[in-house]
Amino acid sequence: MSDESNPPKVILLVEDSKADSRLVQEVLKTSTIDHELIILRDGLAAMAFLQQQGEYENSPRPNLILLDLNLPKKDGREVLAEIKQNPDLKRIPVVVLTTSHNEDDVIASYELHVNCYLTKSRNLKDLFKMVQGIESFWLETVTLPAA
């Protein structure tokens, strides 16, 4: 339960893998942090949501974005670039959560001002711990700008 002085944290997960998004959802279900998880499956939907366009015109502003790089319709790299170039969106922390170990992807993401780049573990237990770490750091430890 939240009140107006302490609204739930809004987490936007942009992930086309249903298995990976289910895992993030399961980890966050165990959370003591009041939150709302919104899952979108492609980059076009993510940008429409963030820019409050079309069916997303009343969407909440996320406190944190978890972004896969390899997305349909609009690549995660393009989404990241658009977020960080938009004055209304650029302060929202973006964590890239991807399977890519490619050094060029890491460098390109940081050049686009990603806040954190994490490579998904193939081991479910390790991936579970990684998502718990994201939650702990980004939703409990740091001070985020108001949504």
Swiss-Prot record:
PTM field: Phosphorylated by Cph1.
Residue ranges of domain Response regulatory in the record: 10-135
Keywords, comma-separated and alphabetical: Phosphoprotein, Two-component regulatory system
Superkingdom in the source lineage: Bacteria
Gene Ontology process terms (BP): phosphorelay signal transduction system
Modified residues (4-aspartylphosphate): 68
Function summary: Forms a two-component system with Cph1 in which it acts as receiver substrate.
Record-given protein name: Response regulator Rcp1
Originating species: Synechocystis sp. (strain ATCC 27184 / PCC 6803 / Kazusa)
Lineage: Bacteria, Bacillati, Cyanobacteriota, Cyanophyceae, Synechococcales
